[in-house]
UniProtKB/Swiss-Prot annotation:
Catalytic reaction equation(s): adenosine(57)/adenosine(58) in tRNA + 2 S-adenosyl-L-methionine = N(1)-methyladenosine(57)/N(1)-methyladenosine(58) in tRNA + 2 S-adenosyl-L-homocysteine + 2 H(+)
Organism, as annotated: Pyrococcus abyssi (strain GE5 / Orsay)
Official protein name in the record: tRNA (adenine(57)-N(1)/adenine(58)-N(1))-methyltransferase TrmI
Highest taxon of source: Archaea
Subunit structure as annotated in this protein's UniProt entry: Homotetramer composed of a dimer of dimers; disulfide-linked. Disulfide bonds are important for the stability of TrmI at extreme temperatures.
Length: 253
C-alpha cells in the first residue's frame, strides 16, 4: 500500500513517465491536473485520472527511473556502461566499493542499488559542487544509508582497506593503480572508465608494472542500437548510442 512520502512513477497514456513524491498537493501536466493524495492507500499497478479524464498508471520506481530523472551536471556514466561494470566485475549485494570521480552520481546510484543496504560505496570527489549535486541525488534516491562522499583526491591515496572493487571515472586512472593494489582484497577488481584510447594505453602500461598484483587487464566498450519495429519491417533506428567510453578491468591476485 502506498503512503504519503513514498516515491512513485506515473505513466501517462503516451508512455511519458513522471517520478514524484506522494503528498497532498496537485500535480500539473499537459494532460490535466492530478490530485496526488488520491494515490495514498492505493497499490502499485492501479491508476488515477486527471481532471481531463486521462488515466495515469502508478508504478514502483526502479533504478532506471532514478537515472533518467536525476539532476544532471557533468557527463554521466551511461547505464549501458554501468551495467557492464557490474556484470564483468561481478559486483554483488554486500560488496564494499571505493569509487572516484562521482560527478552527478549516476554510477554511484547504480552501484548503491546493486550492493544493497548491507553494502557500502565510498566515493572520492575533488570538486565540492559535484559532491553536493551527487549527494542531493543520492539522498533523493534513498541511498544515503550506504553511500559516503569524501571531498578528497584519490590520486593521493585510498584510506579504505579490504575493498571489493575500486571503480574510477578519472582522467588519469594509472595514478591510482598502486593505491588500488594496496586497498583491494585478493580477487577484487580495479575498473577504470575512460573516454579516450590514449588513456587506456597509459593505464595498461602502468598495470604491466604491477603484473605481480593484477591479472592481465581487459579493455572493452559497448555499442547500443535500438531497433525500430514496424508491422512489415525491423531496422536499426537512425540514431544510436555508440562510443561513450572504454572500460578496463584488472583483477587483484
Amino acid at each position: 500500500m502506498i503512503r504519503e512520502g513514498d516515491k512513485v512513477v506515473l505513466v501517462d497514456p503516451r508512455g511519458k513517465r513522471y517520478l514524484i513524491t506522494v503528498s497532498k498537493r496537485d500535480f500539473h501536466t499537459d494532460l490535466g491536473i492530478l490530485k496526488l493524495e488520491e494515490i495514498i492507500g492505493r497499490n502499485f499497478g492501479e491508476a488515477i485520472k486527471s481532471h481531463k479524464g486521462h488515466e495515469f498508471k502508478i508504478l514502483r520506481p526502479r533504478i532506471v527511473d532514478y537515472l533518467d530523472k536525476m539532476k544532471r551536471g557533468p557527463q554521466i556514466v551511461h547505464p549501458k556502461d554501468a551495467a557492464l561494470i557490474v556484470a564483468y566485475a561481478g559486483i554483488s549485494p554486500g560488496d564494499f566499493i571505493v569509487e572516484a570521480g562521482v560527478g552527478s552520481g549516476a554510477l554511484t546510484l547504480f552501484l548503491a542499488n546493486i550492493v544493497g543496504p548491507e553494502g557500502r560505496v565510498v566515493s572520492y570527489e575533488i570538486r565540492e559542487d559535484f559532491a553536493k549535486l551527487a549527494w542531493e541525488n543520492i539522498k533523493w534516491a534513498g541511498f544515503d544509508d550506504r553511500v559516503t562522499i569524501k571531498l578528497k583526491d584519490i590520486y593521493e591515496g585510498i584510506e579504505e582497506e579490504n575493498v571489493d572493487h575500486v571503480i574510477l571515472d578519472l582522467p588519469q586512472p594509472e595514478r591510482v593503480v598502486e593505491h588500488a593494489a594496496k586497498a583491494l582484497k585478493p580477487g577484487g577488481f580495479f575498473v577504470a572508465y575512460t573516454p579516450c584510447s590514449n588513456q587506456v594505453m597509459r593505464l595498461h602500461e602502468k598495470l604491466r608494472e604491477f603484473k605481480d598484483y593484477f591479472m592481465k587487464p581487459r579493455t572493452i566498450n559497448v555499442l547500443v542500437f535500438d531497433q525500430e519495429v514496424k508491422k512489415e519491417c525491423m531496422r536499426p533506428r537512425t540514431t544510436a548510442l555508440v562510443h561513450t567510453g572504454y572500460i578496463t578491468f584488472a583483477r587483484r591476485i
